[in-house]
């Protein structure tokens, strides 16, 4: 019975969030079980372009370090904000969500050529947090019961938290920068006088990921919507 409940809950996670989170967990599990090593996964331009180890373009986004506090913290944020985006502003737009993944991953890989980062998964999570926070500007947040602020400040609060823990803020800055570029090109620039939509999801992605339009006369049975994580007043991060 418990297995069926867990399976049902897992299958209710929207597809992109489910696939990415699962890939991250399985990759970390494989490293933990010593089936593979981080040296086979990290971002290395020379190995990618000279030795054709193309898989590193993907695997460097899937490993968040050994199982521990940092891994759990990153997985919680990745799952929550990826799912909230997919169930919120990208609801019914799976192809657009996949295109955001590809665009963000491409930019981070490009910037990764100039900074000494070997794993980009955490920066990718910050990008997701940034886009969600800018699209939900009036949501009130509470950080460990210490700070109250509106959602757009969340990426900067997380960067300050990283700084307090003695971590490099390059990862956070990269995620914020890529998130802002996407948000500007997708949400701001097209709505400016003379602005145009630069980011256009390729039709092949729509063919693969978007379901055909339903018959407008079809009246489906009501179904329970999967529970999201729409944090509002009084909701604590990490608590």
Swiss-Prot record:
Residues 214-239 are annotated as: Disordered. Keywords: Endoplasmic reticulum, Membrane, Transmembrane, Transmembrane helix, Unfolded protein response. One of its GO terms (molecular function) is signal recognition particle binding. Induction: Up-regulated in response to endoplasmic reticulum stress via the ERN1-XBP1 pathway of the unfolded protein response (UPR). The keyword Endoplasmic reticulum applies. It is found in: Endoplasmic reticulum membrane. GO terms for biological process: endoplasmic reticulum unfolded protein response; ERAD pathway; negative regulation of retrograde protein transport, ER to cytosol; positive regulation of cell growth; positive regulation of cell population proliferation; retrograde protein transport, ER to cytosol; suckling behavior. Residues 79-96, 172 are lumenal. It is a multi-pass membrane protein. It comes from the Eukaryota. Widely expressed, with lowest levels in brain and heart. Residues 1-57, 118-150, 194-239 are cytoplasmic. Forms homo- and heterooligomers with DERL3 and, to a lesser extent, with DERL1. Interacts with the SEL1L/SYVN1 and VCP/SELENOS protein complexes. Mediates association between VCP and EDEM1, as well as that between VCP and the misfolded glycoproteins. Interacts with OS9. Interacts with SELENOK and SELENOS. Interacts with the signal recognition particle/SRP and the SRP receptor; in the process of endoplasmic reticulum stress-induced pre-emptive quality control. Interacts with CCDC47. Belongs to the derlin family. This is Derlin-2. It comes from Mus musculus.
């Amino acid at each position: 019975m418990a297995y069926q409940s867990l399976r049902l809950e897992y299958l209710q996670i929207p597809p992109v969030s489910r696939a990415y989170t699962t890939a991250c967990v399985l990759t970390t599990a494989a490293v933990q079980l010593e089936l593979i090593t981080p040296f086979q996964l990290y971002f290395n331009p020379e190995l990618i372009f000279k030795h054709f180890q193309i898989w590193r373009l993907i695997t460097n986004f899937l490993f968040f370090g050994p199982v521990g506090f940092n891994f759990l913290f990153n997985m919680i944020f990745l799952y929550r904000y990826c799912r909230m985006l997919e169930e919120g502003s990208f609801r019914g737009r799976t192809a657009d969500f996949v295109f955001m993944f590809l665009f963000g991953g491409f930019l981070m890989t490009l910037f990764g050529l100039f900074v000494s980062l070997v794993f980009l998964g955490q920066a990718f999570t910050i990008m997701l947090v940034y886009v969600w926070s800018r699209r939900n500007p009036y949501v009130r947040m509470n950080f460990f019961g210490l700070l109250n602020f509106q959602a757009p400040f969340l990426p900067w609060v997380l960067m300050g938290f990283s700084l307090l823990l003695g971590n490099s803020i390059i990862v956070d800055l990269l995620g914020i920068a890529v998130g802002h570029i996407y948000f500007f090109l997708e949400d701001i620039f097209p709505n400016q006088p003379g602005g145009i939509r630069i980011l256009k999801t390729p039709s092949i992605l729509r063919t693969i990921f978007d379901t055909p339009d339903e018959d407008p006369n079809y009246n489906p049975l009501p179904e329970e919507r999967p529970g999201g994580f729409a944090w509002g007043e009084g909701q604590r991060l990490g608590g």
